[in-house]
Amino acid sequence: MKVAAIQMVSSAQVEVNLRSAGRLLEAAAADGAELAVLPEYFCLLGHRDTDKLQVQEAFGDGPIQQFLADTARRLHIWIVGGTLPVSSDVPDSADAASRSRVLNTSLVFSPGGQCVARYDKMHLFRFDNGREQYDESRALLPGAQPVTFELPSRDGHRWTVGMSVCYDLRFPELYRRYSAAGADLLLVPSAFTYTTGQAHWELLLRARAVENLAFVAAPAQGGLHENGRQTWGHSMLVDPWGRIAAEQAEGEGVVLAELDIARLREARLQLPALEHRVL
């Protein structure tokens, strides 16, 4: 199955970002991609964390979700909409802080344009090294459930796909849960900072692939954004042996590779580590 990890340098204008995403998805489909995965915050990287609140959508309704559905249907490919801000279902009685935050949601659309899976980012990033400060909990609520979906590909294999987002990558127990569910492909749409990405991005992606003997698709934001934030980029596809099948360092682009299920089966046969676990 050909998979595309879409790298973007998203701006603070949703319409501009959707046009860029549409162009990149068209390029991926033209190159034969069956699944295309957009990065975290593909639709908006605003000037303030709270800018997300202004473009939030109710699940199942809104122009960003309509764009994803229409594009999947038009190109007849599977599309994972990195993340978009989705309104939470917290009751009116909840505290004001909860009611003023949204979920960072990854949605999967089938080639028919149906939304077939939803994952809300579970782990919220916080970082402070004295020069850079980030705290996603100011504008986001955490998700609560791991999510997998089934993707019947043209190669005849029915892929089990585990969903995650960015900071989730640092929590291997999530991916162990996916491994136990039979996942052979792990998705990690991200917007790693330059600082943390330079230190840990490739290391963590390859580790998740090797320890779970699974493919990893990791689209990323990669460049200097309008808000002054520098993201690390290096979108990549990693095979179950930890080899990088394709990668792009920075700037927008389509990172494409053929994921061969026979390669995964061979790796698991040669090194049946998943069967040797004792804990």
Predicted regions and their residues:
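CN hydrolase (nitrilase-like) catalytic-core segments centered on the catalytic cysteine
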Residues: 59-80, 160, 166-255
